[in-house]
Amino acid sequence: MLECLSALLVLFAGGGGSVLAAVQSKTVADPNLCPGYNSQLISPFLSSCKRNLSECVSRYFDEQYAFCRSCVTVNNETMEDLDNCKCLQCALSSLNNSCFHDYCTSKDEYDKLQIVVEQFQLTNGVLDDGEILKPRGNKFSSRKLSYFVGQNNTLFRNPLQFEKNQLISALLTSLTNNQKTISSVDMFEVVDANNEVQYLRERTISGKTLSPATGYEEENDGDCSVKDKKWEGKIEYHENKKVSSENCSKDTDDKSGSKKERNTKAPLFHTATEIHMTRWSSWRPKKIFTRYLVNEYQSPKIITTVNRFYRTKTDTETGTTLITSTKAKRRWFPRTKIVTSTATSTFLSITTTTTTNAIATKSLVAVLNPDGLNKKAGINFGLFSANGELASPDEGGTPTVVRRDKISDPGAANEQATLFSTTFSQVPHLPELDSGEFISAASQLDERIFIFTAITVSITTLMMLGFSYRSRVSFRDHSIDDSDDDNDWSDDEVEFDEEYFYSLPVSIPEKGISLDKMAQQLGVE
């Protein structure tokens, strides 16, 4: 067998560089692989169960929990089996819930089984049935071997059929006090010193060989190279003995000289091939073939990896374009400009007011000559004629028209008012005068008339004050007896001397302006 295996490895490694990796795996079929389970501490108690109890446990093994199909915990780096606690949990659950009442009859044994299950759950904890496992493919995966990723990137794999059968058999053996009641299963043993290949132990009972181990397909006795039907020709059986046309498994032991015929079944190998497309060149991609030689026995696993690498010549054309960029830095001085917008609204308001007042004419008598009191001259402040005669009392009043312009500025909050006044005076017709020009007194209301009027009023007021005050009389000349006489201001007791009369510079204009000129100055059309 070793010669056949060596020849097979040389065949795979002949095309290119090869890497041979041997992964030492722990025994999944051993219940003691679970840290919380020790078969030596459990006293066997099963004795009333049927022989085919293991078949029932194996049949309902996968139906207990969702993780029973991938219950072996694997190391992510070394790909070694860490523990089989979940597989052991599935086997105990299948025995307790599905098979005990149909294959066993003792109630005491059932009570002891409940104690074992409870102790296992207390030691290992309650296993999570709701954990979602995602498939993960790698170079160790095959049609019978699948890997899954759980929480915290924990890696799991499915137990092979013979591993599951051996685990169930070992569990029932540790719980049974009479091993004859449990159906025997085929066991594996290591026959070579290097643990590279493991053979199936053969047993001869009454001149017949045992049936193949559980999990393998039937083999053809007449053909030496039997292929598994389920694997469709990808699983090969290899013989390590000389093959003859009559019997493929006959061999003679040279050392012992025994001529006993032995029927030996070689370990099961299969080859997995992965093809990868290179990305070194987009127009000439290359294929990389990776082949794995996998031994599906539990221990050890021999994996042969063949990698072929190709060298690709790549021509690269590089075009260079020179791009020159110039950056100019300019200093900017910030400037602040304040723009003020002012809105001005002008409203024109024209108010026309017509007022007619009767002008009363009074005469103020003033003494113009200091020599006598007989000659008097009348000064008329109303309408008068050019010859200085007093105006007639029948002369009418003067209509006055006043126009007021108002300009309002809402923005500046200013208000300007312009007053235009126009006075129309009428001079009555004097039929007794044959010649001469009738002049209105309103025509004399210019700047000189106003000054003349103000001076006249001031002088008149001073004269009235002078009449009521005697400058030459002192307070010492009066006595208390004369105080009553001083309060008498009757006209008959007033005497005027020449010292009390003064000449006034009174000038009366002889001629006024015309109506047209006065209207032009006043701006009346």
Curated annotation (Swiss-Prot):
Region of interest: Disordered: 242-264
GO cellular component: membrane
Subcellular location: Membrane
Keyword entries, A-Z: Membrane, Signal, Transmembrane, Transmembrane helix
Cytoplasmic side: 470-525
Leader sequence segment: 1-21
Transmembrane region(s): 449-469
Topology term for the membrane: Single-pass type I membrane protein
Protein name, entry field: Uncharacterized protein SCRG_04024
Naturally occurring in which organism (per UniProt): Saccharomyces cerevisiae (strain RM11-1a)
